[in-house]
């Protein structure tokens, strides 16, 4: 699932050939009808307005999540993300205080319906990644569940 609609401008013929071969091998080089219309929409005035509104929603979600974590989850820390909708949450102190592993914490979140991601593949030994590109009501519900059933259970 997903839209294929990116493009590139490469002036170096050798690099262009390598890029085209890689695109062909990946299978992600062919546009479909939905991708074409999405790309056209993205460059329209309405697409710009939509992107502006999306940035506002994501910024609000980031503000909410960062403030919530700092005020409610003792032993959990993070930096405010810049230019992304993903949180990178450091749980090392919380895990040590509760004698738990990251795998146990990840499972606790999943068990209460919070979909989050192991941060170890991103060089965070006790980190969790969390996507905030969703409606505010869902972000609030996720943090309510984490507060009630995971971090302050």
Regions found by a protein language model. Name each.
Residues 1-153:
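PLP-dependent class I/II
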């Amino acid at each position: 699932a997903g839209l294929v609609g990116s493009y590139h401008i490469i002036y170096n013929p050798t690099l262009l050939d390598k890029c085209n071969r890689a695109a062909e091998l990946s299978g992600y080089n062919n546009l479909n009808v939905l991708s074409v219309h999405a790309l056209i929409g993205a460059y329209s005035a309405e697409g710009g307005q939509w992107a502006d509104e999306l940035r506002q929603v994501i910024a609000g979600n980031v503000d909410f999540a960062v403030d919530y974590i700092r005020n409610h989850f003792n032993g959990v820390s993070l930096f405010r993300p810049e230019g992304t909708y993903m949180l990178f949450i450091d749980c090392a102190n919380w895990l040590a205080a509760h004698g738990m592993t990251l795998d146990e914490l990840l499972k606790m979140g999943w068990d209460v319906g919070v979909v989050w991601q192991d941060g170890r593949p991103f060089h965070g030994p006790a980190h969790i990644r969390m996507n905030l590109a969703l409606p505010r009501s869902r972000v609030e519900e996720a943090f309510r569940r984490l507060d009630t059933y995971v971090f302050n259970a």
